[in-house]
Every structure is written in C-alpha cells, then in structure tokens.
C-alpha cells in the first residue's frame, strides 16, 4: 500500500474520462496505475469494444472547463487544433422535387461546440500520460475481480502472444493489485460497477431503446474539400428515424443512421429497399454525397448496434471505489453530452476530494480514508441528480432532432427565447440548449429552469390568445348575421386553443 503521504490510485478504463482522472490524480501527487482491457488505443489495429469506430464525439464548454482544471493547457490546445467547430444544425429536406437546407444556429452569440474524433482524443491523452513519471499504463489487462473492503483488484494479463498458464485449461496469467482507491471509467458494460454491486446496494436501471445505429462516411470532394458545410451538424429528420453527419478534420463526414430495428430488418432485405429508403427519406445523401455502391457496402459491412442508457445510484462504495462516465450514467448520444458529462464527473469528483481534505498533507492514512468516504458520498449526492437529468435530456432530444426541428411551435419558442436572451439579457432567459452546451450549470437545475420558462411562455401565449379571441368574439356577437352562432361552440374553441398553446410551449 502507498504511504500516508501519497495515495495509490488504480483507474480502470483508458478512454478520455479515465485519462483525465489520471491527470487529476497525478497532479495531486498520487501514484496512478491505469488499466485498459484493450491494447494500446493509439495503435490503428486495436479493435474497439463495439468493433467499429464510434459516433463522432461532441466537445462543449463544460467538457473544456473540466480539461482546463487539469492544469495542462497545452493538452487543450493540442486537442483544439484537431477538432472542427460546429455552430448549429443544418436541416435537410425536399419539396416539390427541389432539395433545400435550413440552418439553425446553436447560439445567438455565435458560440460553438466541436466535433472530435475519439481516436485523436485517445492519442493526445495517452501521449501526455506517458510523459508523467507517477503514471503507469497497463494495456491488455482485464479486471476480473475486486475486494473493495481489502482494497485489492485482480486483472488477467492478456498480452499478445502470451501463452496460457500450464495446466490452467487455457487461463491467462492473473495479477493482484493493491490500491487506496479505484476509479471505474470502463464504460457502459463496466466491470468495476459489476464488482462494486457485490458490496454496495446499488439501484440500477438499464434500458435499450428501440433504435439501432449504423455508421457511414461521406468522403471529401475530388479537390479534397468538404462536400457540405463543415460548420454544422447535418440532420435529415424523419418521424421515427434520422440520418446525421458530423465533419472530421480530414474533410470527410462521419454519418449515422438511427432507426428502429424493424426498419433495419426491412433495409437488410435488398439493395433496392435500402436505396429507395434513402432517396425517399434522406434526399441529397445518395448519390450526391455517397455513391449507391458505397452506401450499400457500408450498410452491409458496418455493424447495426443498439443504444443503451443506464442510471444507477450510488456511484461509490465506502472510501475505496467510485464510478464515473458511462460506467455511472451511460446516456443516449442525442445531446452530444456523453463525453462532456464524463469529463465533468472528474472535475466534480476531485473538487469533492479537495474540499473534504483528502489531499491534506498532515492527514494520516485512516483520516484520509474517512475524508475520502465523505468526499465520495458528497460526489454521489451531487452527481446522481445531474446524471439522471442528462440521461432524460438526451432521450428527449432524440424526438426533437428527428421531428421537433421541423415543427413551427419548436421554432417559435426557440425564436422567442433567443430574442429575450439577446435583447433582454438581464432577464436571465436562455434556451435549454444554450444552458446545457455553453455553461457549467447543473443539468438538474437546467431542467427545472426550462420547465418554469415553458410555463411562463404558456401563460403569456394563453393570455394573448384569450385577448384576441375575446375581441373576436365581441365583434362577432355584435354582427346580426353571426349572433346565432352557438356560444358554447365558441367557448369550446377558446378552451381548445388555450390548452393547445399551454401544452405546446410548456
């Protein structure tokens, strides 16, 4: 075990969230060991856990804030040189045989998110970690067991070419690792969470939505340029499905088809069904951006994967283990906050450790363990509500992206809220998207504020509608030819219109 003056921290999972945790811990003087199930993620041949490249990641203000708190500004600068700024959505459609596109800015002040490649983030983080003397990296190590009372973990070492143990029926070598505390950043199917649940009474909810996703690629133009605007998230919305495209630094676009499993089953029947589906619902994609042969080949070759969301609580056990990122709150990808929420977890976690005196140089090992337990409890108490909130927001945003972006009521509310934000900033009025993407406000607070704003707008719309209908009713009542209209019918129309206004904007 580490001496009282220095903790030994074991981190499981070498994705961006686990790497940021290593940076935070190392900066505070901890000895850090980072274990990853896969091989070195910087090696192109390393197979991702889902056997495909992932949806491009969205990096926004709160994620960048968490990176800045690591104290390594050069890492942020390196990342920001390898991302593409995204200033809004571009909605695509076709009317009367003519293709159209309509931009929707994210923010009235021109602020932006960034489209980031996961592989690039892995490279930048791991290269940085290798330069830090109190961080050790262990690839091809699978967490197989943990005792969170004795603070021990066991890993199978699955090194390439290493032979199984003699007489072990194919088992590979296993190592035992001691730690002061362990951070599980090992994704939605977290082994850390699985073993933690043997010690903690964890409420756990897992749900697969009836939507699969498949990745496609729009290549650069023959002149090595973007074929469509690189400043937007491109959306071809449908009521039950959608196709999106995010730009990459190589001038290509990483695209994703989201659709129910039943639609995928139909599209798998024949090439004709696939091409007809794209022509009907995603006009301008094929053949303008992806050739029919490439579209078909990518649909056949790339896996059709499910989407999972996870809620659980607590996120820790005693003073020995805490889970972060997707291990604690896997969210659907439709708000672009999965990475940002995970990075923010690390900032919130280490803020709690600092606040509770875990890094007080005068603390002995027992006092430090008690402080750590209090810090972990505070982290769970603070973060659970926000983790559940961004989970719910991400689910709701799927409906907005595939259908709401085309609805007049959605566009009206967005216009009004942006106008209030721009012209009357003292009111503190902002759109929900602005609060989520361009602030560090807690997700749970954002939901409460957005509901209140919706009620206010509903009341204002309702009052305005009542005034208009009342004046209209008085005018009609004074007309001899219309006085025979049923007053009850008029009252019913008034109530129906008012109810529609309130429910549509709340």
Curated annotation (Swiss-Prot):
Family to which this protein belongs: Belongs to the aromatic-ring hydroxylase family. KMO subfamily.
Cofactors required: FAD
GO cellular component, one term: mitochondrial outer membrane
Molecular function via GO: FAD binding; kynurenine 3-monooxygenase activity
Top class in the EC scheme: oxidoreductase
Reactions this protein catalyses: L-kynurenine + NADPH + O2 + H(+) = 3-hydroxy-L-kynurenine + NADP(+) + H2O
Gene that this sequence comes from: bna4
Organism whose genome encodes this protein: Emericella nidulans (strain FGSC A4 / ATCC 38163 / CBS 112.46 / NRRL 194 / M139) (Aspergillus nidulans)
Main localization (coarse): mitochondrion
UniProt xrefs under Pfam families: FAD_binding_3
Keyword NADP: yes
PANTHER family xref list: KYNURENINE 3-MONOOXYGENASE (PTHR46028:SF2)
BP term (GO), one: kynurenine metabolic process
Protein name stated in the entry: Kynurenine 3-monooxygenase
